[in-house]
Amino acid sequence: MHYARIVSNLRLGYDIIHMAEYVTLTTNRKAFHNYFLEEKYEAGIMLLGTEIKSLRSGRVNMGDAYVKPQRGELWLVNAHISAYECSGHTSHEPMRERKLLMHRKEIALLMSKVKEKGLTLIPVRIYLKNDIAKVELSLGRGKKLYDKRDTVTKRDTERELEREVKYRNFRR
């Protein structure tokens, strides 16, 4: 797999396959553009076998995904996990709602913050942690149009400064 690396153990004389602890599969880039992200939380996700295989091959899109609370549970909605090509007719539905796994106290805390402060719960990225799929959730406050413009101009000025510094160092 693309995220495994082999670690040689010279004393014992064999190779150990060491899996990377965190492997990011996808990020929700719209979330960084549309929200001020504040606190981060980790949640497990209930997936079918074909879904985890599609995730590992990188066939997932979280562009319009959001988290919906329902009867004391959290559900990931509009996350598109493509059908696994080798599954045949037993494949999963790509746009189905997927249950997020968290402790009840954590869910209650998140829901109280969402109701009280006017924050939104946004899925930021899906990653593998020791071969288990996890979703990083973040509490976010929506940006206004002028906030989005400010972040774009700040990013552009930082890029220009980096280019100038790089150019000056190159000329010496």
From Swiss-Prot:
InterPro entries found in the cross-reference section: SmpB, SsrA-bd_prot, SsrA-bd_prot_CS
GO molecular function: RNA binding
A Pfam family it matches: SmpB
Domain of life assignment: Bacteria
Gene Ontology CC: cytosol
Stated role: Required for rescue of stalled ribosomes mediated by trans-translation. Binds to transfer-messenger RNA (tmRNA), required for stable association of tmRNA with ribosomes. tmRNA and SmpB together mimic tRNA shape, replacing the anticodon stem-loop with SmpB. tmRNA is encoded by the ssrA gene; the 2 termini fold to resemble tRNA(Ala) and it encodes a 'tag peptide', a short internal open reading frame. During trans-translation Ala-aminoacylated tmRNA acts like a tRNA, entering the A-site of stalled ribosomes, displacing the stalled mRNA.
Protein name: SsrA-binding protein
Annotated organism of origin: Dehalococcoides mccartyi (strain CBDB1)
Lineage, top ranks: Bacteria, Bacillati, Chloroflexota, Dehalococcoidia, Dehalococcoidales
